[in-house]
Every structure is written in C-alpha cells, then in structure tokens.
Amino acid sequence: MAMQWRDDGFRYGAVTRGLHWAMALLLTWQFAGMGVKIIVGKAPITAFWVGTHKGIGVILLTLIVVRALWGLYNMKTRPAHGGGFWGLAVKVGHLALYALMLIVPALAMLRQYGSGKPLDVFGVRLIDGGWAEVPWMTAPANAAHGLLAWVLLAAIAGHILMVLVHHFIWKDEKVGRMIS
C-alpha cells in the first residue's frame, strides 16, 4: 500500500508524519543542548550546541504553525482518539503539546524582538534590532520561556510513555498510525 499524503481515519499521512518526526528530532536537539549546558557548563561543545538554539527554535516555531494548520485542514479525516476518559485525555494532552510547542518559541521571539538586538538565523537576518529594550516584551519571556520548555519536556515524556503503554501493554496498534 502506497503512503498517502493526507491523513485518513486509519493512519496519519506522509505530511503529518514528516512534521511529527522532524519536530521530534529538533526538539530532542534543543533539549539535549540545554542538558549539555547544565551538565558540562561553559565548553566548546556547549557553545556550539547552544549557538544553534535560536535558529532551531525559529524552525520549530515555523513547523508548529505549519503542523497546526495542516492538522486543522485534516481535522475531519484524522484517526479518531476515541471516547470516554482516555479519549478526552488524548485530546487534552495533544492540545497541551501543541500549545506549548507554539508558546515556548513564540515567547523566545517576543524576548528577542523586545531586546532590540538583531536576530540572525543561519546567516539570514530576521530582525534588524537597533532599538532600546522593551521590558514588557522581555520580562514575560525571561520569566516563562525556560520554565514552559521544561513543562513541554514533561508533556513529551508523558506522550512517549503513553505510546509505550499503547504498544506494550494495551497492544492496540495505535502506534502504527504514526510509524507504519
């Protein structure tokens, strides 16, 4: 059976899967980099890894917007989450993941813009900067970006745990919707 581009009632299509796994890899990179920063401290590997953080964050922000729009476009044809408590839990869990994946990089962009400093991502200038810091923009991001990122990591861990429960305990083939 050939892979379809769009989602259907049985499995996610190639676009949804591609966006999911691209974001999974980039989020792993982001969290691993912050882990290296915490464990190793200042070192060349830390400087390299953390030096990619803003650029990868911009890519993640772009991907989550595309992913959310694609999800809305496919809303009526996506595999059902089911009803009852677990169906509601899945919907709330996915909504929380999407919200955090949008809010965390959006706060970073707000902080960057409010800092008045330029933003260059992989050699491309996205924000010129050159103005005074705007505290009402930087303060919320300074307070919440890192904290919400760790909340996102906890939500991702919960997501992975439930994937493992579906596959190894409930043996209900839900995992196949995203990987086969």
For each feature predicted by the language model, list its residue ranges.
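Membrane-embedded alpha-helical bundles that constitute the cytochrome b-like, heme-associated redox core
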Residues: 1-180
